[in-house]
């Protein structure tokens, strides 16, 4: 149990570090949305930012981490909103540094005969707004005026599972 707690703490620290690195300002005049949150609204601008900083690249977790188990709750009605928020999807995404860190944690967990099941990773900003409309409590949903690690591709909702049985660990 100590090793599991250690791995989860390590994952949290790594993801928080990457989240901070991802959110550094590149000297570009930012745009704000209706909440005053700085956003990139033009895909061409985003592509330019990725060329300047590959850490902003979003990567497909199924390709980045072979064997990763996904149970994307917001593509089903099995979530706190009790409705499908995403179309049926078969993968999800994270920024490259977060995905690299997650891959390292999965490799360490394999030594303990465990792996990770992902419930959610990258989340479109529009979904954050829908969640906030239903639950205006930042203990349970991200305040759209701040955005979230999910919106930035730097957060995952997950649990640990046995890789053979796919049974979730009690946590």
Regions found by a protein language model. Give the residues of each.
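Short active-site loop/helix that positions an aromatic residue
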Residues: 131
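Bacterial Sec-dependent N-terminal signal peptides
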Residues: 1-30
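Extracytoplasmic cell-surface/polysaccharide-interacting catalytic and binding patches
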Residues: 26-119, 134, 138-171
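Segments that shape or occlude catalytic/ligand-binding pockets
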Residues: 124
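Short, well-ordered surface patches within globular domains
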Residues: 127
């Amino acid at each position: 149990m100590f090793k599991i707690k250690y791995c989860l703490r390590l994952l949290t620290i790594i993801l928080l570090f990457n989240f901070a690195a991802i959110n550094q300002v590149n000297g570009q005049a930012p745009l704000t949305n209706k909440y005053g949150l700085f956003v990139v609204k033009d895909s061409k601008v985003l592509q330019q930012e990725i060329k300047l900083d590959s850490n902003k690249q979003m990567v497909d977790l199924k390709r980045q981490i072979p064997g990763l188990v996904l149970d994307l709750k917001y593509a089903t009605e099995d979530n706190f909103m009790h409705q499908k928020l995403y179309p049926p999807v078969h993968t999800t995404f994270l920024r490259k540094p977060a995905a690299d860190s997650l891959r390292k944690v999965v490799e360490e967990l394999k030594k303990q005969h465990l792996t990770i099941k992902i419930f959610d990773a990258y989340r479109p900003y529009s979904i954050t707004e829908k969640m906030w409309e239903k639950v205006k409590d930042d203990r349970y949903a991200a305040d759209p005026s701040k955005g979230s690690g999910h919106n930035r591709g730097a957060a995952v909702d997950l649990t640990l599972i046995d890789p053979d049985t796919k049974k979730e660990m009690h946590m």
